[in-house]
């Protein structure tokens, strides 16, 4: 049983009855689920994950004080704290993890302010441009078990829909970094006798390539620890995971370097094919830099288009 399944089972066994019996007037106002930080919200938790922050628990998200006053929130917190301390052989933690409590009673506005800087999830263009994909994933990942009002569901749905101009700006910046690091600087660093710098170039190529692949899939990239696991599950370009892993985990002697450069070019070609499939580029070549500027040229908002191409990276 993974964390999401554990959370739902704990809620159904104890949380739902607690709400129904002790807070019947709040049942339709409270959104319940497991959302926010943690591998369990992504379905990536495994046996290793159980050594920290793994416990039966769920989130109770309250509307503003006009609908749920402070006293009600306090009573709900106290009732949640009194739920069984152990469930299915797993104990609930008595202390909050680093970064604050992940379960229990939260205000909707506080949750979304912490994750994306907006209590209602309505972001400015600049916020969209600057927010890390991980922050957007934490705001939209996990699962809601109940949301009668639909308010949290609506906010999460809006945050999943990155504006197209923003997606293009992010793509353009990372495509340019892929070109600089992989297609241009990798072999040049080796010719300069700088193998460590060459590996840094590989790292930059891989990091930006992963950002591009998630953007092309219209989904958000997770914390780097889970990036490869998430990459392998994507519907498009999932096979790049194997190539990128090889680039990161092999050396840079002369024979390997030529092979790795061929892989960089092959990966670039796959990315370009998908850019063309989505109508994002008008360039016709294998140079990712030219495609980066073509993607940027396709941004409709002149203010966003005219920002430095690396503004989002």
Task: Go through the PLM ranges and name each one.
Residues 20-65:
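Active-site nucleotide-donor binding segment shared across nucleotidyl transfer reactions
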Residues 42-46, 57-59, 86-90, 194, ...:
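Ligand-binding pocket scaffold of soluble enzyme catalytic domains
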Residues 62-67, 192-196:
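A generic structural motif
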């Amino acid at each position: 049983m993974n964390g999401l399944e554990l959370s739902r089972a704990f809620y159904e066994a104890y949380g739902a009855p607690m709400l129904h019996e002790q807070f019947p007037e709040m049942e339709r106002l409270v959104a319940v689920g497991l959302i926010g930080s943690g591998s369990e919200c992504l379905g990536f938790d495994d046996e290793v994950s159980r050594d920290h922050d793994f416990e039966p628990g769920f989130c109770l998200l309250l509307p503003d004080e006009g609908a749920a006053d402070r006293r009600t929130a306090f009573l709900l917190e106290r009732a949640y704290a009194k739920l069984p301390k152990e469930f299915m052989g797993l104990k609930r933690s008595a202390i909050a993890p680093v970064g604050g409590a992940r379960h229990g009673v939260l205000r909707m506005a506080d949750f979304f302010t912490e994750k994306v800087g907006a209590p209602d999830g309505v972001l400015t263009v600049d916020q969209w441009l600057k927010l890390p994909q991980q922050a957007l994933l934490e705001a939209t990942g996990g699962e809601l078990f109940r949301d009668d009002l639909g308010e949290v569901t609506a906010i999460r749905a809006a945050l999943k829909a990155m504006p197209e101009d923003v997606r293009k700006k992010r793509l353009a910046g990372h495509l340019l970094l892929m070109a600089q690091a992989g297609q241009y600087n990798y072999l040049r660093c080796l010719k300069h006798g700088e193998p460590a710098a060459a590996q840094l170039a590989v790292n930059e190529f891989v990091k930006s390539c992963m950002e591009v692949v998630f953007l092309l899939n219209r989904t958000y990239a997770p914390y780097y620890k889970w990036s490869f696991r998430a990459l392998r599950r994507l519907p498009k370009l999932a096979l790049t995971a194997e190539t990128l892993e090889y680039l990161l985990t092999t050396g840079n002697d002369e024979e390997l370097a030529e092979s790795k450069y061929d892989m960089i070019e092959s990966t670039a070609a796959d990315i370009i094919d998908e850019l063309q499939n989505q109508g994002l580029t008008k360039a016709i070549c294998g140079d990712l830099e030219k495609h980066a500027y073509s993607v940027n040229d396709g941004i409709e908002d002149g203010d966003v288009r005219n920002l430095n191409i690396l503004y989002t990276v």
